[in-house]
């Protein structure tokens, strides 16, 4: 059984609730809102209703009877007194005007306050410019354009040749190809412009043996293992480059220093060629580890095979010869052998 104040929430039998009202209607609807007319106007409307009730023969009605008659009158929509105005009055408190389709004002292409044209989408600009498609306002400027605009001066100065550079090249007898410019581009204006062009034959090293079964390019060390570049050590399975350029001179200098050290009596200056050929791998790959462990496994298996006892294979002829030599006079062993073997 529910307990509580029986008069709360607009109960019919309670003191706070009004008789004849729905108890589920909240208080902010049942109570009179603040935006209604003044008490004088309400009293005038009640007197008019009372006069109408006396004419109809019902007699004068009290305030409770009026509330019981229509207690939600302040939320009812009433037609406006002006015909065909498209308005609706809410108990004369305020008037909301909803214009019809014919009377609605069309939007102008110009703003009346600022007198400026409205920005519209330009399909031609959007189709021609990819950056404009990224933004709903076609005035979008990406960051890359600002970067190119700021660095445009240094880029063009590198490609263009001024008069001082031309005179210096003529004095030294150099060509634009020697400096890194392309001479095939036609000259335009007082300044000679050359764009550096990469040769088509200049191909990446890892693309040279794509169709071959053996890959000569090492992605770890980024070395192309060709015979011209170096050799592969059969012991360590590592690639050793041939010494070229300054490395050859360094080797000659080291040899002279070693000879001078030996003459002066320094005996610790010894050279081990095996250590020089050794390559230290800071992070060996799985293939390198497998190549190192494979000979060790072969040695272990060979040692195990040598240590295991060998089993002799049975041979009929050898058995006959041994049996005849051990006991030549006995024929029973021979008969048994012929019978069961």
From Swiss-Prot:
Residues 42-57, 320-331 have a biased composition (Low complexity). GO terms for molecular function: pre-mRNA 3'-splice site binding. Residues 1-90, 172-196, 292-341 are annotated as: Disordered. Keywords: mRNA processing, mRNA splicing, Nucleus, Spliceosome. The keyword Membrane does not apply. Its main location: nucleus. The keyword Nucleus applies. It is found in: Nucleus. It comes from the Eukaryota. One of its GO terms (cellular component) is spliceosomal complex. Residues 292-301 have a biased composition (Basic and acidic residues). GO terms for biological process: mRNA splicing, via spliceosome. Signal peptide: none annotated. Associated with the spliceosome. Belongs to the SLU7 family. Involved in pre-mRNA splicing. This is Pre-mRNA-splicing factor SLU7. The lineage of its organism: Eukaryota, Fungi, Dikarya, Ascomycota, Saccharomycotina. The gene is SLU7.
């Amino acid at each position: 059984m529910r307990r509580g104040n029986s008069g709360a929430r607009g109960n019919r039998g309670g003191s706070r609730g009004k008789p004849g009202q729905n108890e589920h209607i909240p208080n902010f609807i049942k109570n009179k809102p603040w935006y209604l007319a003044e008490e004088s106007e309400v009293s005038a409307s009640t007197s008019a209703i009372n006069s109408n009730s006396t004419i109809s023969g019902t007699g004068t009605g009290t305030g409770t009877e009026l509330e019981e008659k229509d207690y939600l009158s302040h939320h009812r929509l009433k037609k406006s007194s002006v015909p065909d105005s498209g308005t609706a009055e809410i108990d004369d408190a305020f008037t909301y005007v909803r214009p019809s389709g014919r009377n609605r004002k069309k939007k102008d292409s110009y703003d009346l306050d600022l007198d400026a044209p409205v920005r519209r989408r330009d399909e031609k600009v959007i189709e021609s410019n990819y950056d404009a498609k990224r933004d709903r306002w076609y005035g979008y400027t990406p960051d890359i354009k600002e970067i190119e605009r700021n660095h445009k001066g240094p880029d063009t100065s590198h490609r263009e040749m001024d008069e001082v550079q031309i005179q210096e090249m003529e004095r030294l007898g150099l060509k634009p190809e020697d400096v890194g410019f392309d001479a095939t581009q036609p000259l335009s204006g007082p300044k000679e412009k050359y764009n550096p062009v990469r040769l088509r034959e200049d191909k990446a090293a890892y693309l040279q043996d794509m169709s071959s079964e053996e890959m000569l390019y090492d992605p770890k060390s980024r070395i192309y293992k060709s015979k011209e570049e170096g050799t592969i050590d059969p012991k360590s399975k590592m690639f050793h480059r041939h010494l070229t350029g300054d490395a050859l001179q360094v080797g000659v200098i080291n040899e002279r220093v070693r000879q001078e050290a030996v003459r002066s009596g320094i005996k610790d200056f010894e050279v081990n060629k095996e250590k020089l050929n050794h390559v230290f791998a800071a992070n060996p790959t799985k293939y390198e580890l497998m190549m190192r462990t494979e000979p060790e496994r072969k040695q272990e298996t060979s040692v195990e095979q040598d240590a295991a006892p060998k089993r002799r294979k049975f041979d009929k002829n050898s058995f006959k010869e041994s049996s005849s030599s051990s006991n030549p006079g006995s024929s029973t062993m021979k008969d048994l052998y012929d019978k069961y073997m």
